Amino acid sequence: MVTGVASAMAERLKEDGNNCFKKERFGAAIDAYTEAIALSPNVPAYWTNRALCHMKRKDWTKVEEDCRKAIQLVHNSVKAHYMLGLALLQKKEFTNGVKELQRALDLGRCSNPTGYMVEEIWEELSKAKYMEWELVSAMRSWELNSLKETCEAALNQQRALDMSRTEESSDEAYTAHTERLKALERVFKKAAEEDKPTEVPDYLCCNITLEIFRDPVISPSGVTYERAAILEHLKKVGKFDPITREKIDPANLVPNLAIKEAVAAYLEKHVWAYKMGC
């Protein structure tokens, strides 16, 4: 059991660590947080603070260890899931890394939807998703090209075999062979379309940011905006709808779950859209 004295000492050590961190003395900060953990090991912030220091030093193994411990103590730690996701991405564990970043994003949106961390997490999640897609897309493209070449070679061999069995080639046989090659080209062109970036549909994009929705909300006038963008507009420009000019109270903004689900479905099928504007 941690005594009150030990808890107070741990808090002072945490403050020492925070001061060292601000001065970019990450080694000293780690030492302070480590002492705090020794005195009071069940405080998640000590573990996430130390993990942040390890992250600054790019010691990703220790980042992962500290974040996992923090999550054991409190499962809804935005910072712990976020840094764990980054650590896993560094280990090329894209699937698990993306999963942790998505968890951090969901938690962040619930606790502080307009906070800086939500934007930061989204940016990292987008990069991770796009990077994962690039790797998969490159492999898929190579496989398609390899298969296409094999199919073309097989058709050409069949054409040569057919010609060897007859003394003279007919126009019909030549035309049939050409049509088979064209059909093959169409099939593989269609298969490659999945990985070809196109324009994102307008209804999935915010009229303010001109980017695909992340956290869409609908105004009383029926127009959907990105939550952070419309809140910033209401705060800095005025409490009115930027399109209809009708007055808006931030409390009247409602999550547009239908658009959010549509965006999720679109991104699931078109991962390249994480990096595209509208």
Swiss-Prot record:
TPR repeats lie at residues 10-43, 45-77, 78-111. It is an enzyme of class 2 (transferase). Gene3D superfamilies: Tetratricopeptide repeat domain, Zinc/RING finger domain, C3HC4 (zinc finger). Interacts with HSC70-4, PP2AA1, PP2AA3 and PP2A5, as well as with UBC8, UBC9 and UBC10. Also interacts with the chloroplastic proteolytic subunits ClpP4, FtsH1 and FtsH2. The U-box domain is required for the ubiquitin protein ligase activity. It catalyses: S-ubiquitinyl-[E2 ubiquitin-conjugating enzyme]-L-cysteine + [acceptor protein]-L-lysine = [E2 ubiquitin-conjugating enzyme]-L-cysteine + N(6)-ubiquitinyl-[acceptor protein]-L-lysine. This is E3 ubiquitin-protein ligase CHIP. Residues 143-194 form a coiled coil. InterPro entries: CHIP_RING-Ubox, TPR-like_helical_dom_sf, TPR_rpt, Ubox_domain, Znf_RING/FYVE/PHD.
